[in-house]
Structure formats: structure tokens, C-alpha cells
């Protein structure tokens, strides 16, 4: 449908109307998290969603019509988000929704919602996510779907949590794992990776001399507010943030444009806090010591042996990702024992590779085709 062309006066009028409404009722412009679901499990702030099947015969994803498959694949698909982003990113907009895309392909779709972390949740640790919650999540999906196996589609830190779970549990019920922009080798992740690599030895020396570890310090000192993650994300492309704000001003009259733009902005503006205990574990084990890349890691009292992972693995990296380099994401293939494993570099930055305007043509399409032959 072609948009009606508006004159300057009409554009000014609608710019004022939309500007006032955006200021007073900003949620009117947010079009994420619209897919219907049931909550099948919850523990503290974490919950698991089961999405309803689509009633449509076809849906539109990024301008392309996709027929809705009426026959379900036997193995359910579990979506695992990173800790810093809310679950909305998997159901970003009706026409750019990973949830709707995989529902249309005939998958029984589940999603983990890690919840809204506050300063009261500073005790949440890697052990909480990996050793306590992940087993419960997997079991709830298997019970709900009446399936003995599960496939996982994960993004960024969500992929690392899935890998740590598999490395500690030796769970053979996870048949397929997809990781998107997951920084397995953190010392290879751009400028931050080079800094971590450079300070690794000095940090070890200082820790040994002073007989002190970050792990011994109170967790409350390490709690990271969501706005910090938002700022760091935006600083990877400062000009992009400026241009986006300018574009919103110029298109204030266009309600549909505003809905998309403000929904995307909500992703980056409303990031979730990182719990202090989790940050301590990440900083020492994953960032400074790069333990996942080494293939072995201690999580609480459990040993994570990544060479015990033998499920099918598909990994992605974005060709313009400033946060997670291709070599950092590809490292997953080296630490697992899986025979069926592959890696793709696809168009997009850290967000674009996952849910950008062209992700459905690359990351999603490749994943859907790959899973189809492994979900019977």
C-alpha cells in the first residue's frame, strides 16, 4: 500500500501531534512483544514462555510473504536471550520477529525471560543461571512439548550460558545448538579483547602478590546498571546514534516510521542490569582468564568440560560486529567435540546479525534450513 504524500503543513501538524503523544504516551509507539504466549515455568525473576501457534495462512517478515507450516517439527525450539537485553528482542516487531518466523516454519517455540534485574538481585551468579535455572528450563520445555529432545537458538551471552550448561551437565537431550554473536574467545573480541589479553598476565601477577581476587570482594560493588550497557553499546557506533536521533526528528510526522524507530531504540535504551555476582564470575573466568576459550572452566563446584559437548552446532558472526569478532565467535568450533558443526559470517553488526532488517535473509534463513533437517 502506497503512503499518501503529505504537504509541509500536514507534516508539521502530524509532527506536533506525534511528538506530544510520544512524550506523554510513549508506549503507544512500541510494537514489540505482541505474540501470544503462556508462562509454563517461573523461578524468582526468571520465567519460560510457550508461544501460541499462528492462526494465519501466511505472515510477512521483512517484506517477504512466508507460508505458515501447519505440520510441527518434532523437536521444540528454545530461544535464549543475553542477560543485558530483554526478551522483546526475539519478538521485536510483527514483521521482524524471530518468534513469528520460527512459528511460521512449524517449530514449537519457547523462550527464556531472564527477568528484570535490580540491585536486590546482586546475588544472582553464573551458578544460578547455568547450574540452577538452565536444568529447570530444559525440563520445563521437554515436559510441555512432550519431547525428549530440544533445540536451542541463542544470542550473545545466551549462547555462552547454553554452552556452559552443556559443558557442566553433559545433557544429551539438547540435539542442536545455534549461537549468534557469542564471544567464546573474549581475548579476540576487538579492542576490548586486546585490552583483556594485554592485562591478563599483569592481573595474575598482582593478584598473586596481594593474595586477593575479585571473587573475594562483595558482589554489590560489581552490580552494573542497565544504562551502562546501553551507553557502551551506543559508543561502538556514536555517529549511528546521532544519525538515528536526527532521522527521528525529520520523520516525526510518519507514525509507522516512529513505531519502528522507537521500538528499536527501546532495545538499546532499556537494557537490563548485570547482577554483581555474575559480573564477578564473568570478569575473572571469562574475560581476564578467557576460560571458555581454553575449553575448561570452574562454575561454582562444577567443572565445565567443553569437549564433552557433542550436539550439532551452528555458529554465526556479523561481518561488521564491533563487539564480537568473527574469530571470537568461531572459537566455539574448536572447544567442542561435535562432528556436525559449521560457522557463517553474515551481514550485520552486533544487533543486525541477530535482528536487523536483513537478518531474515541470512541468519534466520540459514538457521531454519539447518534445523529442519535436524528436527525430525
Which sequence ranges carry the predicted segments?
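Alpha/beta-hydrolase active-site loop
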Residues: 123-142
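Short beta-strand immediately N-terminal to the catalytic nucleophile in serine-hydrolase-like folds
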Residues: 152-154, 180, 316
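Gly/Ala-rich beta-loop-alpha elbow adjacent to hydrolase catalytic centers
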Residues: 153-162
Amino acid at each position: 500500500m502506497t503512503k499518501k504524500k503529505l504537504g509541509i503543513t500536514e507534516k508539521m501538524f502530524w509532527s506536533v501531534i506525534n511528538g506530544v503523544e510520544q512524550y506523554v504516551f510513549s508506549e503507544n509507539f512500541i510494537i514489540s512483544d505482541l505474540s501470544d504466549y503462556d508462562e509454563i515455568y517461573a523461578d524468582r525473576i526468571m520465567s519460560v514462555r510457550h508461544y501460541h501457534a499462528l492462526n494465519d495462512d501466511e505472515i510477512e517478515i521483512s517484506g517477504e510473504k512466508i507460508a505458515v507450516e501447519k505440520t510441527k517439527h518434532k523437536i521444540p525450539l528454545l530461544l535464549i536471550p543475553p542477560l543485558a537485553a530483554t526478551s522483546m528482542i526475539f519478538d521485536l516487531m510483527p514483521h521482524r520477529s524471530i518468534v513469528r518466523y520460527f512459528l511460521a516454519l512449524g517449530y514449537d517455540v519457547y523462550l527464556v525471560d531472564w527477568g528484570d534485574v535490580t540491585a536486590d538481585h546482586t546475588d544472582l551468579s553464573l551458578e544460578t543461571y547455568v547450574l540452577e535455572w538452565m536444568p529447570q528450563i530444559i525440563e520445563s520445555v521437554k515436559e510441555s512439548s512432550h519431547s525428549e529432545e530440544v533445540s536451542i537458538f541463542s544470542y550473545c551471552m545466551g549462547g555462552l550460558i547454553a554452552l556452559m550448561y552443556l559443558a557442566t551437565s553433559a545433557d544429551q537431550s539438547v540435539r542442536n545448538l545455534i549461537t549468534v554473536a557469542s564471544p567464546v574467545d573474549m581475548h579476540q573480541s576487538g579492542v576490548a579483547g586486546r585490552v583483556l589479553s594485554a592485562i591478563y598476565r599483569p592481573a595474575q601477577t598482582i593478584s598473586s602478590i596481594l593474595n586477593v581476587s575479585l571473587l573475594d570482594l562483595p558482589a554489590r560493588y560489581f552490580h552494573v546498571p542497565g544504562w551502562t550497557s546501553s551507553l557502551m553499546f551506543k559508543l561502538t557506533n556514536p555517529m549511528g546514534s546521532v544519525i538515528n536521533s536526527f532521522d527521528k526528528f525529520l520523520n516525526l510526522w510518519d507514525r509507522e516510521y516512529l513505531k519502528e524507530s522507537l521500538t528499536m531504540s527501546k532495545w538499546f535504551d532499556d537494557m537490563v542490569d548485570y547482577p554483581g555476582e555474575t559480573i564477578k564470575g564473568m570478569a575473572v573466568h571469562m574475560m581476564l582468564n578467557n576460560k571458555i576459550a581454553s575449553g575448561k572452566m570452574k562454575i561454582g563446584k562444577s567443572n565445565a568440560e567443553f569437549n564433552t559437548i557433542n550436539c550439532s552446532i551452528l555458529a554465526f558472526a556479523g561481518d561488521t560486529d564491533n563487539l564480537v569478532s568473527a574469530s571470537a565467535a568461531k572459537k566455539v568450533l574448536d572447544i567442542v567435540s561435535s562432528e556436525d558443526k559449521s560457522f557463517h559470517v553474515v551481514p550485520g553488526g552486533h544487533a543486525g546479525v541477530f535482528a536487523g532488517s536483513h537478518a531474515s535473509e541470512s541468519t534466520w534463513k540459514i538457521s531454519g534450513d539447518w534445523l529442519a533437517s535436524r528436527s525430525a
